[in-house]
């Protein structure tokens, strides 16, 4: 391999496309659940999946696979968090369709968020601020900043896991689907924005970060 080839930069996904890839499958899930009967009447093959939540689950799996495929084709890499989330979607989605039991897809956010929270907080026990490995390309922080941010995100992921359990066990399926899209995302965005003071306080310039 030549030096020029070795130095060839990776293709970066634009922020807008990244947002579409992350939110697209969720929007498909919401639309398919709310319009499941209409989709089943227009596309008989979908009717074989079952009721609206099962049609939504099948299309959610397909949209997730498409999002991962687009990400891979553009960057030749798959971000760790979307990859783990995608694997859980495929496993729990398949169980949902196979057993015709929507409990599995409802538990997917609980499993994913608990896993992320446990990994982040567990890494701190070994002196590793794992969040830095995920977001190091986005911004540079000192060690204390990464540690604090890792703690906050770890706790936040566990909070989302508990919140999902409360919602799906206490409310209807339609409410849970709507909250998954219109509740969880705004909460996550607000939490992310709330971390900006910490990020600015512990930011280091590129020269000091080397």
From Swiss-Prot:
<dbReference type="Pfam" id="PF04279">
    <property type="entry name" value="IspA"/>
</dbReference>
<feature type="transmembrane region" description="Helical">
    <location>
        <begin position="78"/>
        <end position="98"/>
    </location>
</feature>
<protein>
    <recommendedName>
        <fullName>Inner membrane-spanning protein YciB</fullName>
    </recommendedName>
</protein>
<feature type="transmembrane region" description="Helical">
    <location>
        <begin position="12"/>
        <end position="32"/>
    </location>
</feature>
<keyword id="KW-0997">Cell inner membrane</keyword>
<comment type="similarity">
    <text>Belongs to the YciB family.</text>
</comment>
<keyword id="KW-0812">Transmembrane</keyword>
<dbReference type="GO" id="GO:0005886">
    <property type="term" value="C:plasma membrane"/>
</dbReference>
<feature type="transmembrane region" description="Helical">
    <location>
        <begin position="175"/>
        <end position="195"/>
    </location>
</feature>
<keyword id="KW-1003">Cell membrane</keyword>
<feature type="transmembrane region" description="Helical">
    <location>
        <begin position="153"/>
        <end position="173"/>
    </location>
</feature>
<dbReference type="InterPro" id="IPR006008">
    <property type="entry name" value="YciB"/>
</dbReference>
<keyword id="KW-0472">Membrane</keyword>
<feature type="transmembrane region" description="Helical">
    <location>
        <begin position="53"/>
        <end position="73"/>
    </location>
</feature>
<comment type="function">
    <text>Plays a role in cell envelope biogenesis, maintenance of cell envelope integrity and membrane homeostasis.</text>
</comment>
<keyword id="KW-1133">Transmembrane helix</keyword>
<feature type="transmembrane region" description="Helical">
    <location>
        <begin position="115"/>
        <end position="135"/>
    </location>
</feature>
